[in-house]
């Protein structure tokens, strides 16, 4: 008696290898700097999951976790050995236990809620008064399907982007060439120009790409950046 084949269906996004490599580098950066409790498993550590190159497990508190599976060699019968894809699923830890497929926008929203800061309720008031407020570190988390951004969020995001652009212009044009005869003075001026100045209208902060699922799935080729400091 021949055994009947059983198939497991997954929703996947076909992506190039270099995009996976870029996303993995971004994840390693945040796991190292933020001490994120994300788990990385190689293919030999995953059982009953053929064609799985690696897996990232992202805990979401006591409720559940997100599993990001990276696949390779999906169509060996056609000789497409360099075919890569990724699948995202949510696993519940509560009774009744279940798992379900996630789209990148929903996954980004869940990750944003648990791991990255966002605008607070008092951000609008602080922005109007010229006070510092916490920036949104994960803009991709607000692109959930069917979700219409509020006017307050759009205003704060525009203000945040304006501060970032003004900061970039200040960095490029703030230090002038003082000539070869004043090289020591010029170097000293450059060192002081790079520092964070109290009372300045410009906010300087380090930026780093965030581990967005939309970026990994190829939906957003442009990297989304995080702002590690607070703005005005």
Curated annotation (Swiss-Prot):
InterPro entries per UniProt: Vif (IPR000475)
Residue positions where Phosphothreonine is found in the record: 100
Predominant localisation class: host cell
Keyword Cytoplasm: no
Induction: Expressed late during infection in a Rev-dependent manner.
Topology within the bilayer: Peripheral membrane protein
Entry-annotated residues carrying Phosphoserine: 150
Keyword annotations: Host cell membrane, Host cytoplasm, Host membrane, Host-virus interaction, Membrane, Phosphoprotein, Ubl conjugation, Ubl conjugation pathway, Virion
Top-rank lineage group of the source organism: Viruses
Compartments, record wording: Host cytoplasm; Host cell membrane; Virion
Entry keyword annotation includes Protease: no
Residue ranges of the region described as Multimerization: 157-169
Locus of motif HCCH motif: 112-142
Gene Ontology CC annotation, any one: host cell plasma membrane
PTM (free text): Processed in virion by the viral protease. Highly phosphorylated on serine and threonine residues.
GO biological process, one term: viral life cycle
Motif (BC-box-like motif): 150-159
Family indicated by similarity: Belongs to the primate lentivirus group Vif protein family.
Domain observations: The BC-like-box motif mediates the interaction with elongin BC complex.
Subunit (UniProt): Homomultimer; in vitro and presumably in vivo. Interacts with viral Pr55Gag precursor and host APOBEC3G. The interaction between Vif and APOBEC3G is species-specific, which may play a role in restricting the replication of SIV to their host. Forms an E3 ligase complex by interacting with host CUL5 and elongin BC complex (ELOB and ELOC).
Functional summary from the UniProt entry: Counteracts the innate antiviral activity of APOBEC3G. Forms a complex with host APOBEC3G thus preventing the entry of this lethally hypermutating enzyme into progeny virions. Functions as an adapter molecule, recruiting APOBEC3G to the ubiquitin-proteasome machinery. Targets APOBEC3G for degradation through the assembly with elongin BC complex, CUL5 and RBX1. Binds viral RNA and affects the stability of viral nucleoprotein core. May play a role in viral morphology.
Other noteworthy facts: Vif-defective viruses show catastrophic failure in reverse transcription due to APOBEC-induced mutations that initiate a DNA base repair pathway and compromise the structural integrity of the ssDNA. In the absence of Vif, the virion is morphologically abnormal. This is an African green monkey isolate.
Name this protein carries in UniProt: Virion infectivity factor
